[in-house]
Amino acid sequence: MAASAIKRLVKQAALRVQRERCHAQHARMAQRLLASLEQYNGALGSPIQRQARDYAHEVLGSAKYAPWLKVYSAVHGSFVEGWIPGDYYQLVVLPCKNGQIGQATNTKTLTKRLLNSAALPDIAYLIDGIGYAADYSVVSAPALIDLLFAADERIFFKPDRSFQGQGIRILGRGDISPETLARLPDGVFQRPVIQHQIFDALTPNSTATLRLTTAKLPDGSVELRAADLRLGRANDRYVRAVSEIRVPVEMATGVLWSRGFMPDWRQVESHPDTGTSFSNIQIPGFHQAAAMCCRLHQGFPHLGCIGWDIAIDRKEDAKIMEWNARHNSIVFSEATTGPSFKWLGWESLWKR
């Protein structure tokens, strides 16, 4: 057998192993959530479970995609056609629609160059041990420190290739010296966003983050397809995926649902720490934030789906905390406000 054929077979085997690991990981996550949901909502009926398996097999190409469909059904109370499972999104949609270029969104030091937006709260960057101002001009270490704290007592540092709040550091002037700068990885320094007053009652110790998901349509236009508000806990200095509370947003009005979801997807009607109800809260500047994200996505048509983490400041202006086209999970929005991605043809991508 030729060496090229052997390499091809080895690559195919490695891809199969990778896919099976992905399925197994998603199945474990989905099964944990389903068990939690069934504690509060009762067991998911056999007919619904059968619908999920049949739909996964017949429409999405494999019954292995059924676990997330069961979770969505448990949240919704019935099965709905058109849902996209989390592992199908990761294994099929992302490679087809975002490709390798989606990884660029995880390089935070590159974001401003790509988006060219004043909505980014970037102050400076650290790249290969060298400091750069927001316009990518080189600055010395002492000048960089002065620049970072020219207007703020504390700033945020986010390493490249980090997501879900991992690796974030909150730094004061006393925390940074030329020596400590030399030990930091590549990353972006951002100024803190003073959130709109309406969020202070919900999460006073961390900045509430609006997760907006935009998708490219078959005609090339871009639409907002999902939205929810992410809130930190009392002990969190920033919103963390492991502890956050998520509240769906009605996209037509920008109004919060009356119920939010804990990390185990148990539903609550108010923030567990502050006691503030979610009812009748309208996100300030919601439609302007959505329009901005759609406009920026339109200018970056290489990507089929983008998750945007947005903070709303005191003036109702949207600030881009992160964008993600590589690890932007869709399972929460699918379970709560979905199906969010109908009429895009995603359910047929596996046939390519």
Model-derived regions, located:
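Phosphate-binding site of ATP-dependent enzymes
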Residues: E153, R173-G174, P178-G260
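Short catalytic/ligand-binding loop motif for oxyanion handling, primarily in non-cytosolic enzymes
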Residues: I130-D135, Q164-G167, S221, N235, ...
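Short, flexible loop/turn elements at secondary-structure junctions
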Residues: P159-F163, R191-I194, T214-K216, L231, ...
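Conserved N-proximal alpha/beta basic substrate-recognition cap immediately N-terminal to
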Residues: E20-A143, F163
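Catalytic micro-motifs at enzyme active sites that drive phosphoryl/nucleotidyl and oxygen chemistry
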Residues: G102, T111, A143-D146, F157, ...
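Intrinsically disordered, low-structural-confidence terminal and linker regions
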Residues: M1-M29
